[in-house]
Curated annotation (Swiss-Prot):
Gene name per UniProt: rplM
InterPro entries to which the protein is assigned, alphabetical: Ribosomal_uL13 (IPR005822), Ribosomal_uL13_bac-type (IPR005823), Ribosomal_uL13_sf (IPR036899)
Family: Belongs to the universal ribosomal protein uL13 family.
Taxonomic lineage of the native organism: Bacteria, Pseudomonadati, Pseudomonadota, Betaproteobacteria, Burkholderiales
Name this protein carries in UniProt: Large ribosomal subunit protein uL13
Single GO cellular component term: cytosolic large ribosomal subunit
Top-level taxon of origin: Bacteria
Gene Ontology biological process terms from the UniProt entry: negative regulation of translation; translation
Pfam families: Ribosomal_L13 (PF00572)
Length: 142
């Protein structure tokens, strides 16, 4: 008997919605990364995108433990000399709710074409509303 290998046409991608209110950033990110990769499914195949679509609402209400809201720093660089900017978690959440969660999940996914396809299945919204009701996402508790 040979090893099972999922075919891309046979994979069913389900939709899930996660309410991130008062959840810890890293715990949500690790569970989301696992589900985007499809490792929770019995048909998981490393070279095939077997993951599900994840919609995260209330990302503006995410928490971090300890003093990380001030100590955790996110860096960007414009490409010009001296063009580095630093932003802490609190300021990033105030300006772009959900950006910290997107960066955390992206760091947990594989790099390359398959990983880039996986991150496109993540939809993050700062408020309680999302435009994906037509897909009938199931509630997922973390």
């Amino acid at each position: 008997m040979s090893t099972f290998s999922a075919k891309p046409a046979e994979v069913v991608h389900e939709w899930f919605v996660i309410d991130a209110t008062d959840k810890v950033l890293g715990r949500v990110a690790s569970e989301v990364a696992l589900r985007l990769r499809g490792k929770h499914k019995a048909i998981y195949t490393p070279h095939v995108d077997t993951g599900d679509f994840i919609v995260i609402i209330n990302a503006s209400k995410l928490k971090v433990t300890g003093t990380k809201s001030l100590d955790k720093v996110y860096y960007r660089h414009s490409g010009y000399p001296g063009g580095i900017t630093a932003t802490n978690f609190r300021d990033l959440q105030a300006k772009h709710p959900g950006r910290a969660l997107e960066k955390a999940v992206k760091g947990m996914l594989p790099k390359g074409p398959l990983g880039y396809a996986m991150i496109k299945k993540l939809k993050v919204y700062g408020g309680a509303e999302h435009p994906h009701t037509a897909q009938q996402p199931k509630a997922l508790e973390i």
